[in-house]
Every structure is written in structure tokens, then in C-alpha cells.
Amino acid sequence: MQTISATYGNLSLVIPAFQEENGIRQAILEAEEALSNLNLSDYEILIIDDGSSDSTYKAAQETAALYSHTRIIRHEKNLGYGAALRTGFEASRYEFIAFTDADCQFHLEDLAKLFDNIKNSDIAVGYRFDRQDPKLRIFLSRGYNLLVHSLLGSGVKDCDCALKLFRKNALNKILPEARNFFVNTEMLHKAACHNLNITEVPVRHRMRYAGKSKVGWKEVPKTLKTLVPYWFSNHLFNASETQGTISKEKKGNLLAYFTGCVILLLFSALLFGARLRTPLLEPQEARYAEVPREMLLNNEWVVPLLHGKPYLDKPPLSYWAVMGLYQIFGIEDWAARLLPCLCGIAIILVVVSWGYFAGAPWEGLLAGFILCLTNRFIYLERMLAPDSLLCLWTTLGLCLGYLACTQKKMNLACWLGYSLCIGLGFLTKGPVALVLLAVPIVLWTFLDKRTLKPSLGMWGFALITAILITLPWQIAVSIREPDFFHHFYVGQNLLRYVAPLDHEEPFWFFLPHLFLGTIPWIFLLPGFITTICKPNSNKQSMGSFAGFGLIAGVVIFTFFSIGGSKRPIYLLPVLPPLAIILGCQVMALVTQKREKIVWQSILIPGTEGSFNFLGIILLIGLGISFAGIFRGLLKPDTGFLLGFLFLTSLCIWVIVKAALPDKKMSFAVTGAFLFLTLYLGVSELLPAYNQLFSIRGQLRAHLKFEKKKPSLVVCYPHLWDSAPFYLPETEVISFSRSEKSQMILFLNQRPNTLLLIKSGKDRKELVQELPQHLEFITDAQQGTVTVGWIRKKSDEHLQGNLVP
């Protein structure tokens, strides 16, 4: 008798089973018959009963007793399809391991095809070329395969086909963690990450032998709940943060890092500390300087005051901070502006420290530089408003929340700091702080499975801490002002968000502000998206630090975009997470070997000579734009717009010019150029702009030749907050549009009155309606508000030298 030599080696076949009492016998019979005819040296069949409550286990035992190759392993409770497979894989003894389902939908003779194709591969997977499932099952499977291919770039036609063959050493590298039907996707993605060779083989398919499929609509959300976090943690942001850690052995790296920190601190101090004496702009800065002034003069620490009346639109923390600065430095506009400037420097330091403690020090340092050299951040964070302080609490809170959840066990000190930031943010701007700080942490801990998920008790602790911080003030102000709750929570928060009375803008309102305000760094964003979404499964360029920055930035940006009321300063909390994203992208660019840098895609010069000529033209255009403003050749708005366009183009030109050949030098030159440009802006352009368009500048111009300060100032159509701030000893009254006739009568009785009126239509109508013997005299350049005198036409101006 001729003996047939074995050609395939030893095989372990794993068959998970759950509630398969009517089909498990047939599954074992078919497996024994097919494997006995496969020319195997030896084989074993492992039936994994996943806690079935029917007679699956009993039927499997009875059938296995007839064969020496079949073993039964039982879970005491149902752990899931993936858990059953892993149990079988770990119990397997042989060099080749295959698995199939207990529904008998595959012809196990096709394992021979898989063996034939695994000779030069690590894994052989089947794909069903003649699928016999119900239409719903086929629809769900095809949709899922399309989704997996789009997200993970697996490249496998039929990833959930339950007929696969592995080499044991390869399988040990990709053992699944998922317990549900996501197990196939997970193993294939891990195989791609380990550069394992995968061969696809067509296999036959048929209807179930008995029972009902366990896959249906109910499995879709369960699988997505596993797929999306896996995609986020293992594909988009799968790098280890320790890759960028500063090597202690290399003192040069440590010296370079701390030198960079010192330079960044110097840049921040110069950009935020320059020309703080610029006048306050209406209406925002003047209001938030006047409220703490009135509170301080009235020794009022509970109820914010504006024009002597309760002003309950915002909580008092930013007012308290400005009051403290007034007490130290006196009631000055520059003292009030110290608050946002100190907040701006602190935010940059928080971002750098965040990266350091997160294991991404260079990314954090680069993010700090990008934030410091972002024109929108410098402009908005120098502006006096509660949003500046809110941005600090938001950034610090997100940093501490991130660090609390990325340790081996929950860092209670960081979580306490996170909780305090929620309370302080609430005391600065209201319940919006809870949304900005809680939603990113909740979403991130769901998506990134490498993190610790805060328990309900931890969230309760955070909420109680925030309440303890804010409740004393809320109780005190409610006792004094019974209408506080409705005005603050309903009017200023809920209705302002869903049905605003002012500042209502379309959904896309922030997009142009974000784009123009972050040039040139925003051009890194497409490269960042390309980097994280590229199909290479084994890429490792971005880690959890970048992932959290993306989540936080998207959540905050979306929240404010959905809201009805929109103002440009609401963008502030978005900018630190965006800087983190772009800092990680810069780090990826300067550390990866690439022939071309991303900036080169912005502009491709025809020749070196023409490119240099373009730079000269842009520089000349920039100079002409701002020279035209100060010489009166161009309107200020036109000149600033042209100057900004030329400046932006020049920034891009410098970046492209510096991109060859050293990428690090490219970004260094770009940063230096941006710093010089921004410093010019904050030291010369912004003060000039504020001087031209603020009320302080116009008041000085009109009072320059007066012998004494005016005893009365009239405001129309509302009270301008700069008037009482800069003329604290002067009586200030206001008239609304409905009171125009009374105002004209009042001015007729009180000529020689200083009038502050809104420019445009209001000013034009008033001039037309004044009595013939009165005239409105204004010599100062108009801004939002026009300042002038109401005088009798025969009056002569008194000469003097009084300058407030």
C-alpha cells in the first residue's frame, strides 16, 4: 500500500460557537472529514463554547467523544466572538492555525487553497466570491468592508470572511483585544502594521446549516463603537509620545530645548508687553475696563456695575482681576490691559509645559512658538475681555485633564486642578466653561483607548468642586439681585446661544477669521490631515498629544459655530489646540526624510530671478500700503487691508525661499520674520489704529485747546463706556434713538456741549435736524464714534492747553 506523504504540516482549527445546538454536530463532522483528507501531519479541532445557554455544549461533547482530534473549551459566560477566538488561538498547539464559524457556511476543503497560498505568506484569508447570505447581511458586510478600507486602508476585499489561516508566529503578533465581531478587522490591521504578508484566496460559500445569524442591525452600533476608537488610537494617532522625549544623554538636545524656551519667553514678553498704553477700543475694551473701575470706586465686590447699575451679563472673576491691578497700578487703561497680556504669556507657557509632561516636549515647544507667532492670537489676547482669561482656564484645564487621564492610574492632583479650572472658567464666562472643558475630555477618553476613562465619581467630584467655587458668588448676587438667575442663565447663556438678539452670524462665520488669522501656519493643516489619514497602516508620526489637540479644537470650534451669537474673540480657545496640531505637524516634517517640504506646494516659482523679483515687489507694496495710511493717501481700512495682503504674501514668499534645502532653517527663518512683523504691528500699527479710532484719541484732540474739562458729555444713541473712564469727573448722560427729539431740545438749551455720537447714519441725521443756530464741530478723524462740540454758530472757541 502506497503512503501519501503529508505536505501541509500540523493544523489547529478553532471554531467558536454560541447558541448553535442545532448545528454544532454538523460543524464537527464536516471539520473532521475535511481535515482528515488534507494531507496534514496532525490536526486538532478546538470548539469554543462561548457561554451558550442552550444545549450547544452538551451536543459538542457528545460529538467530540466520537473523535480523538476534537477538544471542547467552555466559557462560563458569554464573552463575545473575539474573546472565543482568542481563547482558541491561545490553546492551539500547532504551527498553523485556522478558524471558521460553527454555522457551516464554508467548504472546509478550501483550506487546501489557503495552504497552497500561505507558502510565501504569513496569513492566507478567504473572500466569498459567491456569497449566499441574506440581502441584509450582504448589505451590512459590504458597507462595513468599504468603511474599513476607507478608514484603515486594509486593502482586503472581505475582511470579515470567517475562513483564515495563520502561521503561529505571525498570529502571536496580532492576537485580538476586541471581544466582538471587530476581531477580524483588528487582526488584519495589526498584520499590516507588522508588515506581515497577506494573501487573499477565493472560497466557496453557502447558506447556514441551522439556526440564525448573530449579525444584524444591533451589531452595527456595537461594531462602530469599537471601530472608531480603534481607528483613532491605532491608525490616526498611533505613535508613542516618548518618541520625542529629550534624551538625557545628549546634553546638546537639552540645552537646545531650554534655549528655545528662553527665546519663546522673550518673544512672548515683547509681543504682549509692547505699547500697553494704547487707548481702549469701543465697545468691548472700554466696557470691561469701566465695570471694574465703578466696582472699585463703590467698593462693590458682588454685583458688577456699569453706569451705576447692575451689569449681570458676565461673572465677576475678570473684573476682580482688573480691580486688583487697579489697586496696584492705579486706574489706567494700560493696567487693565495687563490682564489679557499676562494671560497670553501664561497660555503659551501652559502649552509648552503640556507638551513636556505629555512626553512630546519638542511638539509642545513648537506649538508654543506657533501660538506666539499667530497674528490672531496676539491681537485677541491683547484685547481686554473675559474671553482672554477664559482661554487661560480652558487651556490649563484641558492640559490637566489630559495629564490626569494619561498616567498609569488616575492622577488625582491633575484632576483636582482640572476641576478647579472648570469652576474658575465658570466664574469668568459662565457655564460655557463646563462645555469647553468637559466635552473634549469625554470624547477623547472614548476615542483613545490608551487613556483612563474618568468614573462617574470623578465627574461628580469635578462638578462639586466647580459648584463650590461658583456657588458663594451666585448666592450672594441672587440675594442682592433676584432677577439674576433668569437674566444670566436664560438670557445671557441659553437664549444668546440658541436665539441671539445681536451678533447673529452664519455657521461659517469663523472660517475666514481662522484662515486669515493663522496665516501662514494654517497652510500646515492640509499636510497634517494628509499625514494622519494616509493609508500606510504602519505609520507612526502622530500620537495622543496631537489627537487630543484635534478633538479639543474641533469640539470648541463646532460649539461656537453652531451657536447663534458669534464674535471673533470667541475663536481664542480654539487657537491653543490648533497650535498643538500644527506643532506636531512641524515636528513630523523636520524629523521625517522628505525631498520636498509642504510649503513648496503653495507656490512654484518659474525661475530664481523671477521669484526674487516677486519678493521685492511684495516688500515695496507693503511699504506703500502703510505709508499711504499715515500720509493720508489711502483710507485706513483700505490701507490696512492692502498691507495685510502684501504682508501675508511676503510671509509665504520668505517661507518658500527658506524651504530649500534645510527644513529646520526654513521654520526658524519663518519664525524670526513673523516675530519682527508682529512686533512692528503691536508696537506701531495697533497703537496708531487705536489712537485714530478710539474715543481717547478724539477726546484729546477736542480738549487740547480747552481751558477746563467739560462738565457734561452727551452720548448718542447709547452711553459710550470710554467717556466715564477717561473723564471720571464729568457728568455723562445718554439718549437713545427714541429720545432724539429730547436730546436736540436738551442741546439747544445747553450749547457748548461735548457730544459722542455713532458715526454714519446717526451722525448724518443729527446734523440735518439740528436747529439753524447750532452746529456740530468735529476736527478729529472719525472712527466708530465721532466726538465733537455742539456750539452756537457765532461762538468762538476758547483757547487752552488742557489734555486729559
Where are these regions (language model features)?
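N-proximal low-complexity "stem/linker" segments adjacent to membrane-targeting elements
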Residues: M1-E33, L40
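Hydrophobic helical membrane-anchoring modules
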Residues: M1-G9, G153, P176-F258
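Short beta-strand/loop segment that forms part of the nucleotide-sugar
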Residues: N39-S52, I73-H75
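A conserved acidic beta->alpha catalytic loop
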Residues: D49-K58, C104
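Membrane-integral, polyisoprenol-dependent glycosyltransferases
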Residues: K250-W599, P724
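Membrane-embedded architecture of ER/inner-membrane glycosylation machinery
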Residues: Y257, L416, T531-P804
